[in-house]
């Protein structure tokens, strides 16, 4: 019974972290993009439609070149990642999908997956992005 209670606690923690993170991430992306890299680990990796960006400086340069955006999240899912798979680092998988409109471009469907890791300090826990994978989901015209 204790294992079921422990797992439920991890799932609840993952859900709270994911909801808070998604609100912060997309609001920051749309309104304060210059601050977005603060949500990433120093050696985080972003894969944006197949293009790999690694490290805070490269991420800052990449986000700076994107046109302004309006994200609408239609779906959010999350789950804790077993600590044996992450060298006992508390980690959450967050999956989102929705629509985004970048200035000067048509609206696109997208999905985005994040691996968040808990960074603990004596007073709090902050979730940071270790890995981020973004992909447009538009169907090709036939």
UniProtKB/Swiss-Prot annotation:
Nucleus as UniProt keyword: yes
Q: Could you mention a single GO BP entry for this protein? A: poly(A)+ mRNA export from nucleus
Signal sequence span is none
Q: Which CDD domains match?
A: NTF2
One protein family per Pfam: NTF2
Q: Which SUPFAM superfamilies match?
A: NTF2-like
Name of the protein described by the UniProt record:
NTF2-related export protein 2
| Source organism of this protein record | Rattus norvegicus (Rat)
Gene encoding the protein: Nxt2
């Amino acid at each position: 019974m204790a294992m079921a209670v422990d797992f439920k606690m991890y799932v609840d923690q993952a859900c709270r972290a994911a909801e808070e993170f998604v609100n912060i991430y997309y609001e920051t992306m749309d309104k304060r993009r210059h601050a977005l890299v603060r949500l990433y680990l120093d050696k985080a990796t972003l894969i944006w439609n197949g293009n790999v960006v690694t490290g805070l400086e490269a991420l800052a340069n990449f986000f700076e070149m994107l046109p302004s955006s309006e994200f609408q999240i239609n779906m959010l899912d999350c789950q804790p990642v077993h600590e044996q798979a992450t060298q006992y680092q508390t980690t959450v998988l967050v999956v989102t999908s929705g629509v985004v409109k970048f200035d000067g471009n048509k609206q696109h469907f997208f999905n985005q997956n994040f691996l968040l890791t808990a960074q603990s300090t004596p007073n709090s826990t902050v979730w940071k992005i270790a890995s981020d994978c973004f992909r447009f989901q538009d169907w090709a015209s036939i």
